[in-house]
């Protein structure tokens, strides 16, 4: 079965917060690093309201000295949902064959 991974935005945000604190950086430090006018984007990432762009994820990975995969958190329920979808599809498909 091919699994389509999805990102857990809330957990990824918490992970960005954890990595920022682990590296002893403030929100202001990240704001200055990215050249943002204000801190809103950083807070939105940390609160899991949105994800950084690919470019910003790459920059975070370099700043935190981790891989992008170490920043992103996969949603666990994705695997359960895909299994449920596969079973449901099989049941519906088999009912058409009979």
Annotate each predicted stretch with a short phrase.
Residues 1-23:
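A short, Lys/Arg-rich alpha-helix, primarily the initiator
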Residues 1-6, 62, 72-98:
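Short, charged recognition helix plus adjacent turn
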Residues 17, 28, 58:
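Residues within the helices of the helix-turn-helix
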Residues 20, 31, 61:
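The alpha-helix within a helix-turn-helix
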Residues 21, 35, 47-49, 76:
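Residue-level detection of the helix-turn-helix DNA-binding "recognition helix"
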Residues 24-44:
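Short alpha-helical DNA-recognition segment
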Residues 45-46, 56:
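DNA major-groove recognition helix of helix-turn-helix
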Residues 55-70:
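DNA major-groove recognition helix of helix-turn-helix/homeodomain DNA-binding modules
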């Amino acid at each position: 079965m091919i699994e389509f991974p999805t990102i857990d935005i809330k957990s990824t945000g918490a992970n960005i917060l954890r990595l920022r604190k682990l590296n002893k950086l403030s929100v202001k430090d990240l704001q200055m690093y990215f050249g943002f006018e204000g801190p809103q984007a950083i807070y939105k990432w940390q609160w899991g309201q949105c994800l950084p762009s690919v470019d910003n994820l790459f920059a975070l990975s370099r700043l935190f000295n981790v891989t992008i995969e170490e920043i992103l958190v996969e949603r666990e329920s994705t695997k359960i949902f895909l299994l449920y979808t596969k079973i449901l599809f099989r049941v519906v498909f088999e009912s058409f064959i009979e």
